[in-house]
Amino acid sequence: MAGISIFEVGPRDGIQNLKHEVKTADKIELVRLLEDAGLTDIEVTSFVHPKRVPNMADAEGVFTAVRMNTSNTVKHSVLVPNKRGIDRAKAVGATNFNIFFSPNSDFNHEN
């Protein structure tokens, strides 16, 4: 029988479109609580344009803090929309990237 894998995206997807600001420390604490709950595959943040998604403007700080305060048994990934996002993520040590695209070229160009 095959196992079940949980890929948690809440620290990114659950926060990115909120209208109110979520503090960096709260994002880091959320990831820690998810790790404490036993999750081992967590999408931590998104390296998108900070003006388009203000709640992800602190992506570097969130990822760096999470990476420094966790065990090596947890896989942390990040969402990146383009090469600039990948470059920003790599600069803080990210190695697991989730990339999105759309069949709509206008959407891809805008994002």
Question: Which positions does each model-derived feature cover?
Answer:
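Glycine-rich, proline-tolerant flexible connector loops at the mouths of alpha/beta enzymes
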Residues: 40-66, 100-111
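Non-cysteine beta-strand/loop elements that form the S-adenosyl-L-methionine
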Residues: 7-9, 95-105
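Active-site mouth loops of central-metabolism enzymes
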Residues: 7-28, 72-83, 108-111
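Catalytic cores of alpha/beta
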Residues: 82-93
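Conserved, mostly hydrophobic/aromatic
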Residues: 14, 34, 89, 97
